[in-house]
């Protein structure tokens, strides 16, 4: 499974959204209905899945599906 597929799978599981709604440009809050707690849990799930640490100031910049994929790809 690619990084992109793994990130999308986590987003579907964490936010309870349909896979077809998880488009690269989709915003977690505006498009996928996440609240601040959801985004914190999403970042924690990404950290666990990819065994990385995402500092708070970086986590704040991860607001879309593509930004999450890019962050993981650049920090693995």
From Swiss-Prot:
The keyword Phosphoprotein applies. The modification O-(pantetheine 4'-phosphoryl)serine is found at residue 36. It holds the Pfam family PP-binding. One of its GO terms (cellular component) is membrane. It is found in: Cytoplasm. SUPFAM superfamilies: ACP-like. Residues 1-76 form the Carrier domain. One of its GO terms (molecular function) is acyl binding. GO terms for biological process: lipid A biosynthetic process. Pathway: Lipid metabolism; fatty acid biosynthesis. 4'-phosphopantetheine is transferred from CoA to a specific serine of apo-ACP by AcpS. This modification is essential for activity because fatty acids are bound in thioester linkage to the sulfhydryl of the prosthetic group. Its main location: cytoplasm. It comes from the Bacteria. PROSITE patterns: CARRIER, PHOSPHOPANTETHEINE. Keywords: Cytoplasm, Fatty acid biosynthesis, Fatty acid metabolism, Lipid biosynthesis, Lipid metabolism, Phosphopantetheine, Phosphoprotein. Carrier of the growing fatty acid chain in fatty acid biosynthesis. Belongs to the acyl carrier protein (ACP) family. This is Acyl carrier protein. The gene is acpP.
């Amino acid at each position: 499974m690619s990084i992109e597929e793994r990130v999308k799978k986590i987003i579907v599981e964490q936010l309870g959204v349909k896979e077809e709604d998880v488009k690269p440009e989709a915003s977690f809050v505006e498009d996928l209905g996440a609240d601040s707690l959801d985004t914190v849990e999403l970042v924690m799930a990404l950290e666990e899945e990819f065994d990385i640490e995402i500092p708070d100031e970086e986590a704040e910049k991860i607001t879309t599906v593509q930004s999450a994929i890019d962050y993981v790809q650049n920090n693995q």
